């Protein structure tokens, strides 16, 4: 297994999640199906709670905006002739419709996030990480390396995944989190913003991601980069392979101070 020698200036590792620390199938094959299979039960159990009603209100507002779309599913306002059962079924149908088109509306993401939080806390869901991830980040921390997450998923969602993982609570191994509020992952400025936020130079950061466009944006900002190749990730072209340093496991990351 070829080693990736980390340049001496690096004191920070910035990690992507999907396809890097976590199987890319986790969201598609675990998180999304959980919502579809449990949304009605969740709404029945939490319907009277303020948070749930706020989620429904946001979905109703989104439904009004979507009324011009083909096949859109309405959610009636809470007038007296609409029973709770009828309202819940309307919300379920609307969520199914949105998810069938892989939509990312704020209202949908908010409800999904609350459902996942409940499932993580109750133990119904566990965040998945590749087997090489935890031993590697523990070793890096022993070397004094700081570790941050940068994902398109919200910081709250990141903390749930790592806080309730199959390997236990991993948040204590991480120094911080970034999401797209710091900037989009394919824009170089985002990586300079992250360096400024951490309080280091771009050249002090090694970014690990499975997405070549993100790697090139980070590299343009002055970061060191390795593209992580995992089963199920998007295939790399020959040009990608020639332009990027590639690894298949975190175990290939080697620091000068390691024996």
Curated annotation (Swiss-Prot):
GO biological process terms, semicolon-separated: L-methionine salvage from methylthioadenosine
Gene3D superfamilies: 1.10.720.60, HAD superfamily/HAD-like
Keyword field contains Metal-binding: yes
UniProt cofactor note: Binds 1 Mg(2+) ion per subunit.
Cofactor(s) of this protein: Mg(2+)
Catalytic activity: 5-methylsulfanyl-2,3-dioxopentyl phosphate + H2O = 1,2-dihydroxy-5-(methylsulfanyl)pent-1-en-3-one + phosphate
Enzyme class: hydrolase
Keywords: Amino-acid biosynthesis, Cytoplasm, Hydrolase, Magnesium, Metal-binding, Methionine biosynthesis, Nucleus
GO cellular component: a single term: cytoplasm
One Gene Ontology MF term: magnesium ion binding
The keyword Oxidoreductase is annotated on this UniProt entry: no
EC id: 3.1.3.77
UniProt pathway: Amino-acid biosynthesis; L-methionine biosynthesis via salvage pathway; L-methionine from S-methyl-5-thio-alpha-D-ribose 1-phosphate: step 3/6; Amino-acid biosynthesis; L-methionine biosynthesis via salvage pathway; L-methionine from S-methyl-5-thio-alpha-D-ribose 1-phosphate: step 4/6
CDD domains tied to this protein: HAD_EP
Localization annotation: Cytoplasm; Nucleus
Pfam families linked: Hydrolase (PF00702)
Binding site for substrate: 151-152, 185
Protein residues bound to Mg(2+): 16, 18, 210
Function (record text): Bifunctional enzyme that catalyzes the enolization of 2,3-diketo-5-methylthiopentyl-1-phosphate (DK-MTP-1-P) into the intermediate 2-hydroxy-3-keto-5-methylthiopentenyl-1-phosphate (HK-MTPenyl-1-P), which is then dephosphorylated to form the acireductone 1,2-dihydroxy-3-keto-5-methylthiopentene (DHK-MTPene).
Family the entry assigns: Belongs to the HAD-like hydrolase superfamily. MasA/MtnC family.
Subunit (UniProt): Monomer.
HAMAP family hit by this protein: Salvage_MtnC, Salvage_MtnC_euk
Protein name per the record: Enolase-phosphatase E1
Source organism per UniProt: Xenopus tropicalis (Western clawed frog)
Lineage: Eukaryota, Metazoa, Chordata, Craniata, Vertebrata
């Amino acid at each position: 297994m070829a080693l990736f020698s980390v340049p001496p200036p690096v004191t920070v590792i910035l990690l992507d999640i999907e396809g890097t620390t976590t199987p890319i199938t986790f969201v598609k094959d675990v998180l999304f199906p959980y919502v579809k299979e449990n949304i009605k039960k969740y709404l029945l159990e939490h319907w009277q709670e303020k948070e749930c009603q706020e989620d429904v209100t946001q979905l109703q507002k989104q439904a009004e905006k979507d009324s011009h779309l083909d096949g859109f599913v309405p959610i009636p306002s809470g007038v007296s002739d609409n029973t709770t059962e009828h309202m819940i079924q309307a919300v379920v149908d609307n969520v199914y419709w949105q998810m069938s088109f892989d939509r990312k509306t704020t209202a949908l993401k908010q409800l999904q996030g609350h459902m996942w939080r409940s499932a993580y806390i109750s133990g119904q869901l566990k965040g998945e990480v590749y087997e090489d991830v935890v031993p590697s980040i523990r070793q890096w921390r022993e070397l004094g390396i700081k570790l941050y997450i940068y994902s398109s998923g919200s910081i709250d969602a990141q903390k749930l995944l790592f806080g309730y993982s199959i390997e236990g609570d991993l948040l204590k191994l991480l120094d911080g989190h970034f999401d797209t509020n710091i900037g989009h992952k394919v824009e170089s400025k985002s990586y300079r913003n992250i360096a400024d936020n951490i309080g280091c130079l771009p050249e002090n950061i090694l970014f690990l991601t499975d997405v070549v466009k993100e790697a090139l944006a980070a590299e343009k900002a002055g970061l060191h980069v390795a593209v992580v190749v995992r089963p199920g990730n998007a295939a790399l072209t020959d040009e990608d392979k020639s332009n990027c340093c590639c690894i298949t496991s975190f175990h290939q990351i080697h620091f000068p101070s390691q024996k």
